[in-house]
């Protein structure tokens, strides 16, 4: 029974506790719900206030933007109106200027019309005067106008025919020169690059003696020393009345050089007799042989010729050192020709090696032309072939004086280089004299005319400048003077190409300021 009451009491306690807990929780829940609702109302009110604030700010910003856009639009309108006003002003000014220019043009047309009328009247007056003058001239000359014109035209026609013929000849000459223009350019380039030191070797060998008493010792008893010397050297010894001098004569330049050196050593030594003469001559001959080969090797170096060369050919090349032609040393001439030929071959794209070698050896025949028959070109070609030179080199040597037909460009180059070296003013005595004489004649022709003060031949005789006296020669006479000088040069001188005549008339006036 007691257990039942305990269970019942426990159940009642649990029920009462549960009811009390529910009541407590419900009261707390209601309180929290009320607080939450209050917070929600507060948040909503804050949100409404912020929304109102944002709306007002947006309305204010929109009003400000609208005002700014309106101001900008009004400013742009004002600027466009100002620009339109300026354009209208410029157009008005342009219209005014056009109106003013139209007035000026009308005035000019009027003046031009008046001037045209005046010129027409003057032209008619001049035509009438011309007719009067023609009638007067016809009465004075006894010729009609047609007859006078016919005579004048005949004279003019003859003069024009002569001048046209001369112009045709000049044009033909110019055409030929233009055809050779490239060759001339190559030659000019070659000569500009060439600088040669040439020394003319004298062909006369004279040995000075310390005194005339030495002549007797040179002659020897009954002339035995002279006979021994001539037999050993092959040179003629000439002893004449020239004081303190012995002359050696021989067509062979090498033998003449050997004799000169031997004679100088014998005279210096003082011991002159046949045995001593033979000994000295033999020694000198060996020295000269060595010197010839050394000169040949030096020539190979100076001419930039590569490859070996036969000893005999090298010796003959060195022998050209003692040979001269028109005052031009043959060995120096050969080296110069080799350098010219090398540069020309390089310009033309030819074989530089063959051109230089053949040019250096082109005159080697002159060293033995007294020993063999034929010209030096053919002799040199045969000797070069004998010494093992190539066919191209042999043919170029043989053909450089056109005695053998030229077949290659190297043949032409060697012949041209030889002509350039020989024809260069100053290279040979004979050429120099002819060249200077032509310049003197050219200046004399100019000085022979009245009013000429000075005359100078320049550009190697291709131009003459004539200074005239301004008080005697005016501009009109100066033109006629140039024509007269050119005609006289054509009639009296022979020259290649053309000669330009320049007449210079200069007036100078000076005053002193005090």
Curated annotation (Swiss-Prot):
Residues annotated as transmembrane: 3-23
Keyword Membrane in annotation: yes
Record's keyword annotation contains Aminoacyl-tRNA synthetase: no
Main location: membrane
Name of the protein this chain belongs to: Ribonuclease Y
Gene that this sequence comes from: rny
Keyword terms, alphabetized: Cell membrane, Endonuclease, Hydrolase, Membrane, Nuclease, RNA-binding, Transmembrane, Transmembrane helix
Protein family (similarity comment): Belongs to the RNase Y family.
NCBIfam families hit by this protein: HDIG, RNase_Y
UniProt cross-references to InterPro entries, sorted A to Z: HD/PDEase_dom, HD_domain, HDIG_dom, KH_dom, KH_dom_type_1, KH_dom_type_1_sf, Ribonuclease_Y, RNase_Y_N
Membrane topology category: Single-pass membrane protein
EC number assigned by the record: 3.1.-.-
Function: Endoribonuclease that initiates mRNA decay.
GO term, biological process aspect, one: mRNA catabolic process
């Amino acid at each position: 029974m007691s257990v039942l009451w305990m269970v019942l009491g426990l159940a009642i306690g649990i029920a009462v506790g549960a009811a009390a807990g529910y009541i407590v929780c419900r009261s707390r829940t209601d309180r929290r719900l009320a607080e939450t609702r209050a917070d929600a109302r507060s948040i909503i009110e804050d949100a409404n206030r912020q929304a109102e604030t944002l709306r007002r700010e947006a309305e204010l910003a929109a009003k400000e933007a609208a005002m700014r856009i309106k101001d900008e639009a009004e400013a742009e309108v004002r600027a466009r109106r100002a620009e339109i006003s300026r354009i209208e002003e410029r157009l008005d000014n342009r219209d005014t200027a056009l109106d003013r220019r139209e007035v000026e043009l009308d005035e000019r047309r009027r003046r031009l019309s008046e001037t045209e009328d005046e010129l027409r009247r003057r032209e008619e007056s001049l035509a009438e005067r011309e007719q009067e003058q023609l009638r007067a001239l016809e009465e004075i000359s006894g010729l009609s106008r047609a007859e006078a014109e016919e005579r004048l035209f005949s004279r003019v026609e003859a003069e024009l025919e002569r001048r046209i013929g001369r112009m045709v000849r000049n044009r033909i000459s110019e055409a030929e020169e233009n055809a050779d223009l490239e060759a001339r350019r190559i030659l000019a380039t070659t000569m500009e690059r060439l600088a040669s030191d040439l020394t003319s070797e004298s062909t006369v060998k004279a040995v000075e003696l310390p005194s005339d008493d030495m002549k007797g010792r040179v002659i020897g008893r009954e002339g035995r020393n002279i006979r021994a010397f001539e037999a050993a050297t092959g040179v003629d010894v000439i002893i004449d009345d020239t004081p303190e001098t012995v002359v050696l004569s021989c067509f062979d330049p090498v033998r003449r050089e050997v004799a000169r050196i031997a004679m100088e050593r014998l005279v210096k030594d003082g011991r002159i007799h046949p045995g001593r003469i033979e000994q000295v001559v033999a020694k000198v001959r060996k020295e000269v042989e060595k010197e010839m080969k050394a000169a040949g090797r030096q020539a190979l170096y100076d001419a930039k010729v590569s490859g070996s060369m036969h000893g005999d050919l090298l010796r003959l090349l060195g022998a050209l050192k003692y040979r001269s032609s028109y005052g031009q040393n043959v060995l120096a001439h050969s080296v110069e020709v080799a350098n010219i030929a090398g540069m020309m071959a390089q310009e033309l794209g030819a074989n530089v090696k063959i051109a230089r070698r053949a040019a250096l050896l082109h005159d080697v025949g002159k060293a033995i032309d007294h020993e063999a028959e034929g010209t030096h070109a053919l002799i040199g070609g045969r000797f070069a072939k004998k010494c093992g030179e190539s066919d191209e080199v042999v043919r170029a040597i043989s053909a450089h004086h056109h005695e053998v037909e030229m077949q290659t460009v190297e043949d032409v180059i060697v012949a041209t280089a030889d002509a350039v070296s020989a024809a260069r003013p100053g290279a040979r005595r004979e050429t120099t004299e002819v060249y200077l004489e032509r310049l003197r004649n050219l200046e004399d022709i100019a000085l022979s005319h009245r009013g000429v003060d000075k005359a100078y031949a320049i550009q190697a005789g291709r131009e003459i400048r004539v200074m005239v006296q301004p008080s005697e020669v005016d501009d009109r006479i100066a033109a006629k003077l140039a024509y007269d000088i050119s005609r006289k040069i054509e009639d009296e001188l022979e020259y290649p190409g053309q000669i330009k005549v320049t007449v210079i008339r200069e007036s100078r006036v000076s005053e002193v300021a005090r």
